[in-house]
């Protein structure tokens, strides 16, 4: 869906298809992940005895994964929504959403917005539509940005299932990746 929106709306967000690799040191765990992937309909996922970044460990190969710049995508998506007559309300705290023939959104300031559709995008649900909200814990993520010689690492996505997990992606720069 994201790829179709990028193409239709001509959003410049560095969208590209790349290979993905789930890295692992435990072959049994990777085999279980492979079975789960296949049961979920991801039949193109393959087991590889050698990962591209560590020939001593195996990996699962996920073809045709998507990679894009999320902020550029969201900026382009917002422009497309506004161009088509949509409205985006930022820094607006919502306390209630009622769905009937139309959607009525009520803000903390008491303002009501009536519309055909509303997107509620939050990190945690604030509406009482779910009987149980699972435990939410605070987590930290650390990001490293490194310059590497262009072409020195195959443009792919790499991740593992360790705790904490590791995730690597290569992004193009002017003189380095």
Which residue stretches match the model-derived regions?
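Helical element adjacent to the flavin cofactor pocket in flavoenzyme catalytic cores
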Residues: 36-37, 59-117
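A generic structural signal for short, solvent-exposed coil/turn residues
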Residues: 15, 54, 80, 86-88, ...
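General beta-strand structural signal in soluble alpha/beta enzymes
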Residues: 45-49, 88-90, 120, 159
